[in-house]
């Protein structure tokens, strides 16, 4: 039986980026297997954030490959993402992986899809997973109509997603990167 269900959200503002992921792991459509999973991680000397949605084993495979690309390209997020996407499209094994990654540094947010696409959102806000549309909508509304910082926006938007998506809970992992090099967890 497949383990699935999550929400990952990233928001960029003038000071940097914040990324959050919920902690719920669901088996099938009805059984919560874990409440405190950590789906957002720091990569490449704590300068890159990455979150995953989809099959857990597949996501860890992608994390490993993405981290190797970051090392290969000196932490260049966009180059590492594009090179991983090329591999993803070419490799018969990778094409079968059922996962997506949301990756960010202090300047850029990218979505890496299971079809090998690399998408940079126009507005500095991106979400993946079952609760992604809810979190994305809430984050856009908060960003447009308030002066909240990125971390507060991701926390509030994830709370909305948790209220609406049965595969998303309120146990959050939140990571931030500041443009000046600072980071918080």
Swiss-Prot record:
Pfam families: Proteasome. This is ATP-dependent protease subunit HslV. Its EC number is 3.4.25.2. Signal peptide: none annotated. GO terms for cellular component: HslUV protease complex; proteasome core complex. It is an enzyme of class 3 (hydrolase). CDD domains: protease_HslV. Allosterically activated by HslU binding. One of its GO terms (biological process) is proteolysis involved in protein catabolic process. Keywords: Allosteric enzyme, Cytoplasm, Hydrolase, Metal-binding, Protease, Sodium, Threonine protease. Protease subunit of a proteasome-like degradation complex believed to be a general protein degrading machinery. Na(+) binds at residues 162, 165, 168. A double ring-shaped homohexamer of HslV is capped on each side by a ring-shaped HslU homohexamer. The assembly of the HslU/HslV complex is dependent on binding of ATP. It catalyses: ATP-dependent cleavage of peptide bonds with broad specificity. Transmembrane segments: none annotated. It is found in: Cytoplasm. HAMAP family: HslV. GO terms for molecular function: metal ion binding; threonine-type endopeptidase activity. The active site is at 6. Belongs to the peptidase T1B family. HslV subfamily.
